[in-house]
């Protein structure tokens, strides 16, 4: 059995204890890498809005990562993509992206977009493996020294 075969992805409430733990790790990492004006993560309450879907990936009953899909006007935005450092390289990110893409397609979204940090190289590789390409700012984002923008047509 492969590591990916043991990963399940399920809808979750971002206000749950396990989601808060994952989001706390993610926010701490981003806050250690970038100044506040260049951090674009959503709060737990913002993630709980009706137009946002949230999932947790788990393996053997343990939360390993999370991701959110904000369904916006004409596109979907990937938010709060995070994989626990101990679980990286084991298919968790792929499982999360596949789940998110399935949902985006089922709701008729034509494109997925994201903003990520400039030095998060492993995230850039993951997104490229799944067909994302670099693009310019979108929505309310502006060009900045720490942002990389990517998108994928569905």
Predicted regions and their residues:
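Actinobacteria-biased recognition of intrinsically disordered, low-complexity terminal regions
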Residues: 1-2
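Helix-turn-helix
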Residues: 123
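Charged, amphipathic alpha-helical coiled-coil/dimerization segments
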Residues: 90, 98, 102, 107, ...
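Active-site acidic-Proline motif in GNAT/NAT acetyltransferases
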Residues: 84-90, 118
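Ser/Thr-centric signal marking residues that sit
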Residues: 66, 94, 116
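Acetyl-CoA-dependent GNAT
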Residues: 5-79, 84-85, 97-99, 103, ...
